[in-house]
Structures are given as C-alpha cells and as structure tokens.
Curated annotation (Swiss-Prot):
Belongs to the binding-protein-dependent transport system permease family. FecCD subfamily. It is a multi-pass membrane protein. It comes from Escherichia coli O9:H4 (strain HS). Its main location: membrane. Part of the ABC transporter complex BtuCDF involved in vitamin B12 import. Involved in the translocation of the substrate across the membrane. GO terms for molecular function: vitamin transmembrane transporter activity. Keywords: Cell inner membrane, Cell membrane, Membrane, Transmembrane, Transmembrane helix, Transport. This is Vitamin B12 import system permease protein BtuC. The keyword Lyase does not apply. The gene is btuC. It is found in: Cell inner membrane. GO terms for biological process: cobalamin transport. The complex is composed of two ATP-binding proteins (BtuD), two transmembrane proteins (BtuC) and a solute-binding protein (BtuF).
Amino acid sequence: MLTLARQQQRQNIRWLLCLSVLMLLALLLSLCAGEQWISPGDWFTPRGELFVWQIRLPRTLAVLLVGAALAISGAVMQALFENPLAEPGLLGVSNGAGVGLIAAVLLGQGQLPNWALGLCAIAGALIITLILLRFARRHLSTSRLLLAGVALGIICSALMTWAIYFSTSVDLRQLMYWMMGGFGGVDWRQSWLMLALIPVLLWICCQSRPMNMLALGEISARQLGLPLWFWRNVLVAATGWMVGVSVALAGAIGFIGLVIPHILRLCGLTDHRVLLPGCALAGASALLLADIVARLALAAAELPIGVVTATLGAPVFIWLLLKARR
C-alpha cells in the first residue's frame, strides 16, 4: 500500500513538472511569436523593448492568468456541484459580467476608458454571485443552486441579445468582438486586473482539503465535519471574482474551464492537491497556445480566441472520452 502511494506521489510530481515545462515553453513561444519573430537574444534590443516588453509581455501574462483562473474555476465548480459538465459559464457568472460590460458600452456610447469597462464587468459578475449566495443562504441543495445559476445565465444571455439587437454599428462591432473573446487590447494599463487575479488563484490552490471533501458529495462532506454552507459561499464568491476579472480582461472564453479539469482527471489527477495547481498550469498553457494560433493563423487579422479554443479543444476532448471508455 505504501509503495502504491509513493508511486502515485511520484507520478503526480512528474505530471506537475511536465506541465510546468509546457507552460514555460508556451510562454517563451508567446513572447517570440508574432508578425515579427524575435528570438530571446534580441529581447533587449530597441526592437525587443517595443515588441516584447511593451506589447507581448502584458498580453502573455494576461493570457496565462486568465487560462489558470478559468481552469481552476472549472475544477472548483465540478467539485462543488458534483457535475463533470460544470464550468464558469454554467452559473451565469460569465454572462453577468457580460451584461455589466455591455451596459457600460451602450450607456457610455463607447467613450468609457478600459478601466471603467473592467469595473463594470466585475460588478456584473459579483451581482450574479451575490444573487447566487442569496439562494445559498436558503440552504438549497446543490442541484437546485445549479439550476438557479443556469436560469440566471439564460436571463443574462437574453439581456445581451436584446442589447446587441438595439445597438449601433460601432457598438455592435465592439460587443461581438467581446462575445468571441480576445486579448488584442491588453497592455500594461490592465495590470491592475492581472494583480486582482493572483491572490484568489493562490488561495484556491491551497484549499485542497475542503475541495477533496466536497468531491466526495454533500453527505460525506458533512459527515467529515466540513461546514458545507460556509465553503459553498466562499467558493462561489471566489469563482465569481475570478470569472468577472477574466471577462473584463478578455471577454467570453469557453472550453478551458470545462475541458482542462476533465482531461487531467482522465489522466489520473484526482487529488485536488495536484489537480488545482495542475489545472492552473494546463489552463495557462492551453490558452497561451490558443492565443499564439489566434495571432498567427491569419496574416491581416486576429482570430477570436474563443473560436480557437472551441475548434482545437472539442475534438481532443471527444477523443479522450472515447479512449477512456475503451
């Protein structure tokens, strides 16, 4: 038994090391790749100062943090709701952030600065989160809380559709670009949003013990002494914050929160002591690679990153599911 535990521990360490190396390689490639390839030896030249440090580095850091946040949010929701299909958009938090951002674009007539749009997106996500916490205080079951989140998401989606229908051509272009996701407008002015993600990411990665209990189910978690009501509130609030900040940075991005945790579980990473940091590393790597494809796929334009993640991720996910069944 001890030998099996040690083998599993070594395997987990190997996985984390491999994911760390993959993330570092993706980070380096992201800094080098673009309309002009800039190798690491040229990073400190005047050309590298502009393209690498002023343009690519803030974008790369934003992609890395958003990918980690979305993947960890998916892992938290899948444990919290005991549903492998749970992901950040499921509770309506992503759509809530979208409603806040769309309201800011329409009411501000496209004149609001980026920091104001970011605050509105975060506010929209937190409002939906507060409504969910209100439901949670009524001690609803996990399944009913999940259904409440789905209903809120549908309402927010309807509001966004109405807003797009009545928007002007200029606003519509900005809204459609946001709905497909993208990091094209990210620079050092959004560094405060990046910093807002880091403490929550680190805190959740340290909460493996309650997460492992939650993954056992509500009844088992209560029997083990976990204050279920408290942890549900805290985790829903933390997820709402991460999703709101991510939407403020990059718009709506699918696939990462749904598929990354599921793929890692299929690979044998079920202990949240390994799964949570693994999700952060894998989510960051996947979104970095998708962002590189979005930048380089077309010569004259940039693809929406949400389209890239769905196109590349869905076939891989289906293949892994078929392989696991065999």
